[in-house]
């Protein structure tokens, strides 16, 4: 497995750590593939009863590494584009979050620092999210002329009101842990989120694994009805945006730290 992601085990709990701290665990292609591979590996592990998902260094995940944008654009223009289903009902990028939503075992995200863009969607793939009170969140894609396309349109809708989703998606504004808690994106706040997540994971691991897995499947099956179609529509929307004039202007303006000049 790539050194971008590590898996350690404490009793029957797996600790999955994003390990690119010098980039605030930003998502490049190697990181994306490593996250998905970690989920696929743990899905086969009957000895693992709960999973903790965390990030090394000062952030959980700062979102997409802009240096990877050319590869993203290339994927959009390839045969099948984003709508090609390569990981069950998801494409590779959606699988970053959906692999955890679909994991048989419960997943607890321990979140700190920043949870932006793809990192925010990754966090939403967890069953439970425990955040440091000082964490900052954002659906960052709007800043780059894109839409959330890593399962966000499925995962946000099971947690928050539609008007809240619209607000944070349209504006790409940064919001606080208090807002994230009030809006339903975060389960609880803790000054020591990793320790709290590990303690909860150990508690869950002490319950019947058959009952816990069955409960997760039952909850997911009822709350994610119709999500297959939503993932396809999410991919179509992103595919239509990537590489277009306004999307490229959003990226260039962001990198050059100037106001964007969009065409109608």
What label would you give each PLM region?
Residues 55-99, 226:
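Glycine- (often His-adjacent) and acidic-residue-rich active-site loop
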Residues 63, 90, 94, 117, ...:
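Glycine-rich phosphate-binding loop at the start of an alpha helix
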Residues 21, 130-135, 177, 183-232, ...:
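C-terminal long alpha-helix characteristic of the crotonase
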């Amino acid at each position: 497995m790539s050194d971008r992601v590590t898996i350690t085990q404490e009793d029957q709990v797996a600790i999955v750590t994003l390990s690119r701290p010098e980039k605030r665990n930003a998502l490049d292609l190697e990181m994306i593939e490593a996250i998905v591979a970690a989920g696929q590996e743990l899905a086969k592990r009957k000895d693992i009863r709960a999973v903790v998902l965390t990030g090394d260094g000062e952030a959980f995940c700062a979102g997409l590494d802009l240096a990877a944008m050319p590869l993203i654009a290339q994927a959009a223009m390839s045969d099948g584009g984003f709508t090609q289903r390569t990981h069950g009902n998801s494409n590779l990028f959606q699988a970053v979050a959906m692999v955890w939503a679909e994991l048989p075992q419960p997943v607890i995200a321990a979140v700190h620092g920043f949870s932006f863009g793809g990192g925010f969607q990754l966090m939403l793939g967890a069953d439970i999210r425990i955040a440091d009170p000082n964490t900052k969140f954002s659906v960052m894609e709007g800043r780059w002329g894109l839409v959330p396309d890593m399962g966000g349109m499925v995962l946000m809708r099971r947690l928050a009101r539609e008007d809240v989703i619209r607000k944070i998606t349209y504006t790409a504004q940064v919001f606080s842990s208090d807002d994230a808690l009030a809006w339903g994106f975060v389960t609880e706040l803790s000054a020591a989120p990793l320790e709290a997540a590990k303690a909860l994971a150990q508690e869950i691991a002490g319950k019947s694994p058959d009952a816990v897995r069955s409960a997760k499947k039952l909850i997911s099956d009822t709350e994610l009805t119709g999500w297959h179609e939503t993932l396809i529509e999410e991919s179509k929307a992103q595919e239509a945006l990537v590489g277009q004039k306004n999307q490229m202007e959003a990226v260039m303006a962001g990198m050059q730290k100037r106001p964007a000049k969009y065409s109608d």
